[in-house]
Amino acid sequence: MNENNTGGFVPVHSLGISQIVAYGAMFYSFAQIKVELAEKLGLSLETTTMIVSLSLFINVLISSYVGYLTDRSGGLKVLSTGLFIGSVGFICLYFTEDLLGFLFSMLLIGISFSSASYNVAFSAAIQLDDQNSRKNITIITFYGAIASSICWLTIGFLRNYFGLNSIFLMLSLSLFLMGLYFLINLNFKKEKKNEPKKPIEDFVALALSRKEKVIITILMIFGFTEYLIFSTTALSLIQFFNSNFNDPSIAIVLASVYGPFQLVGRFLEMKFATFLDARLTGLVASAFVPLSLIIILIPNFYVCIIAMALFGMGHGLLTVTGGYVPNLFFEPQVIGRVKGYIWAPTALGMACAPFLSGIFHENMNNLIIFLLALSICPFFSLFFIFKMKTRF
């Protein structure tokens, strides 16, 4: 293990808060404001949601380059820059009133999300303290688990009392202040102290060993399927429960259960991390997801609560697994680029979720069955790398 990457200071709570801001502003917020946004721009709801979805595809296109920048300049610098870009994007949304301005705004927001999300925050934690990165990644995900709740409550208040443009200003200010915190208060001194003294280490995909290529490919499959399943399920839960129980209030209650149980899953990960292989906890978590999708088909309120608890714990654990497992096989000096490769299909899974949810919107049971069949992929992905030798 590289001594320069052990025991450094990690602003872990600041990184966690940055994920509340990033995911709240650039992912969760559009679920609440899409109707008002379409009216403001004079566009159809379908066109508006399509453009929002397309902004997520930007992650697929630039994730490898973001990974390169993360290795070259450090995760905190990339994160700070991404937050500033997102702030500009929401200011542009505040002023725009046409399709062209909307496209430009969402381009900036897409670039920002790629540069300021979990992928970069996890890389920063690994660069700063390789030895304790699993614990730090888990703490970061604690904050991310409550991003949707904080975002939806805040946006709901602003929308009801101050209107759509106040939301854009609030999100822009939040992103700007978070970026400014990293830029001024931390000033990157702690990160620089832990960066390698030599130039950026070579990392060429074609020059990787067969084992390294297999590991990256497996983790790409894991990331794509896990986030496709989670994002599609999360976007479809209210409609699914409403169709089964014919009661919107019950649907909202059931759909909200998984969020707190993500925290439970991540607490368990932190509790057992000292003596359990991250791949093993990931295997257990990946079994929770298909189990939850099986029992969710039973139209019983209490059974569905159990299903949502299992789903939340499963995804909560798998977020940590996906963030940490690459570090078992690759050095901190190249982790940004490794995660860049892995993040591209992961982002593709997230971007496909609105489209997939829309296809099955009239038959939610078929969607759940499809996702259930797909859920074997994360399990077998982790199973295949379980016996592979790690660098520790």
Give names to the regions the model predicted.
Residues 11-36, 41-45, 62-66, 152, ...:
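Extracytoplasmic
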Residues 26, 30-37, 212-270:
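Extracytoplasmic gate region of multi-pass secondary transporters
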Residues 61-99:
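Conserved MFS/SLC helix-loop-helix module at the cytosolic interface between two early adjacent transmembrane helices
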Residues 62-74, 265-277, 361:
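Helix-to-loop junctions at the C-terminal end of transmembrane segments
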Residues 100-116, 303-317:
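Hydrophobic core of transmembrane alpha-helices in multi-pass small-molecule transporters
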Residues 115-129, 317-330:
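Intracellular juxtamembrane helix-capping segments at the cytosolic ends
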Residues 148, 332-364:
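A late C-terminal transmembrane helix in Major Facilitator Superfamily
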Residues 277-325:
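C-terminal transmembrane helical hairpin of 12-TM major facilitator-type secondary transporters
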